[in-house]
């Protein structure tokens, strides 16, 4: 187990009396919640390993039950806490796909070499992700993650080259 953890969901409530918790998922990989998988409950600075016993989706939420926790009273204290996975549980992505933590913090430059700022967050409003670039002395710039705009992503050097469309800086 490495020391680096990645958040995959937040427990927002309990569900029923048999120890299920309601989770808002913040991962694209539903299989992170497969029964038998280990996730980590972040409580203060401690990470407590929990093994998933059951998983189902109900009204847009992931409902999880953990092995050894069969009663609402045992999971009540989990409300509001984050679920994480270990770095070695990350899976390889296909080409031109990146984990958010790889993109956030990257410097964004135009094809001409003009520095625009750094990616501070990623939005997922619909068909494609939108990278929010924090600029110096200017309002944030929204960069759609599409081929026409994002030309090169260099994760190793944390640099993203873009070709801005007309009106993007307005």
Curated annotation (Swiss-Prot):
Record domain PRC barrel: where: 95-168
Localisation: Cytoplasm
GO CC field: cytoplasm; ribosome
Keyword set includes Cytoplasm: yes
UniProt keywords, alphabetically: Chaperone, Cytoplasm, Ribosome biogenesis, rRNA processing
NCBIfam families: 16S_RimM
Function text: An accessory protein needed during the final step in the assembly of 30S ribosomal subunit, possibly for assembly of the head region. Essential for efficient processing of 16S rRNA. May be needed both before and after RbfA during the maturation of 16S rRNA. It has affinity for free ribosomal 30S subunits but not for 70S ribosomes.
UniProt remark on domains: The PRC barrel domain binds ribosomal protein uS19.
Record protein name field: Ribosome maturation factor RimM
Organism for this UniProt entry: Oceanobacillus iheyensis (strain DSM 14371 / CIP 107618 / JCM 11309 / KCTC 3954 / HTE831)
């Amino acid at each position: 187990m490495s020391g680096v953890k990645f958040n995959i969901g937040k427990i927002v409530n309990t569900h029923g009396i048999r120890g299920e918790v309601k989770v808002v998922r913040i991962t694209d990989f539903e299989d992170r919640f497969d029964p038998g998988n280990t996730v980590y409950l972040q409580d203060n600075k401690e990470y407590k390993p929990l093994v998933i016993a059951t998983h189902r989706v109900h009204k847009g939420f992931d409902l999880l039950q953990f092995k050894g926790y069969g009663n609402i009273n045992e999971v009540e204290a989990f409300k509001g806490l984050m679920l994480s996975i270990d770095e070695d549980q990350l899976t390889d992505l296909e080409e031109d796909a990146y984990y958010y933590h790889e993109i956030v913090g990257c410097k964004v430059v135009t094809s001409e070499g003009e520095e625009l700022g750094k990616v501070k967050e990623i939005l997922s409003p619909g068909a494609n992700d939108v990278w929010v670039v924090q600029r110096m002395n200017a309002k944030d710039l929204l960069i759609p993650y599409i081929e026409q705009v994002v030309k090169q992503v260099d994760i190793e050097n944390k640099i993203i080259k873009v070709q801005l469309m007309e009106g993007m800086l307005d």
